[in-house]
């Protein structure tokens, strides 16, 4: 497979720069892989796609205010640090700007000096492992000093930081939001639960690799970044019961999909409690283990996320749906509109 098989022309004005005032009023394009029909709806209509006894799986990760601005202790020069991965023992994998200034042993001071970082290792791809020094609670210091790391294609300032969090976000650790979940409101989730749908949560901490472009022409040569995931015993038991009863598992977003399919691949289609790091790459030809249907946003051309959707619904149909969305002026990417991909077995 060639990377250009997943390309399309996207007018820049369709890239949403700000979220809608009301989350669930975004548009929803419904894709039916069986009939290859498309339907224009609104996100609050997603309740019509769910039936009593089904499960809706949400990713409860919370985005960290992971962008820090500091000064080199030695010279006072400005340094921007972006936290990517918690390595434990106060050490984080980071991206630094300007990176060339950040040599091993270099110290950076943030804010009033409550937080300091020392470079302990330089990584092959140019990242830096830093060790933080501080008094107090790290997350509280980060909340007061850090900024939300919005995606590179969003150029507007976000007035309300919570609009880049889902309403069910609780597990700190992501460098980016699981954007498919941004459309849900407490009221919509309550209506879905009242219908008899089980709402099940898992955790996958989204890394910035989600925005990293594929750099090879041959898709099979691409290696995914790894991300931490967790599915609890209670959640796994709920999902097993849904499957056993013949009902469907609906995943909200590619992060929920990648978690469930990682576990399904690991346990031969069974759903077990598990945690660890996943670098699963779902592309056309993949054999699905767990997920029956899902909602997701509209993704970047030539991205692994477009490939994931194509693996489920077929490349030609997905590109047809994307062209329809462009023609109908749907809003794209993190703050944009959504699609719902129905089960192939419905």
Curated annotation (Swiss-Prot):
Its EC number is 2.4.99.17. It is found in: Cytoplasm. Pathway: tRNA modification; tRNA-queuosine biosynthesis. Its main location: cytoplasm. The keyword GTP-binding does not apply. It holds the Pfam family Queuosine_synth. GO terms for cellular component: cytoplasm. One of its GO terms (molecular function) is S-adenosylmethionine:tRNA ribosyltransferase-isomerase activity. Coiled coil: none annotated. Keywords: Cytoplasm, Queuosine biosynthesis, S-adenosyl-L-methionine, Transferase. The keyword Iron does not apply. GO terms for biological process: queuosine biosynthetic process; tRNA wobble guanine modification. InterPro entries: QueA, QueA_dom1, QueA_dom2, QueA_sf. It catalyses: 7-aminomethyl-7-carbaguanosine(34) in tRNA + S-adenosyl-L-methionine = epoxyqueuosine(34) in tRNA + adenine + L-methionine + 2 H(+). Belongs to the QueA family. PANTHER family: S-ADENOSYLMETHIONINE:TRNA RIBOSYLTRANSFERASE-ISOMERASE. Transfers and isomerizes the ribose moiety from AdoMet to the 7-aminomethyl group of 7-deazaguanine (preQ1-tRNA) to give epoxyqueuosine (oQ-tRNA). Monomer. This is S-adenosylmethionine:tRNA ribosyltransferase-isomerase. It comes from Lactococcus lactis subsp. cremoris (strain MG1363).
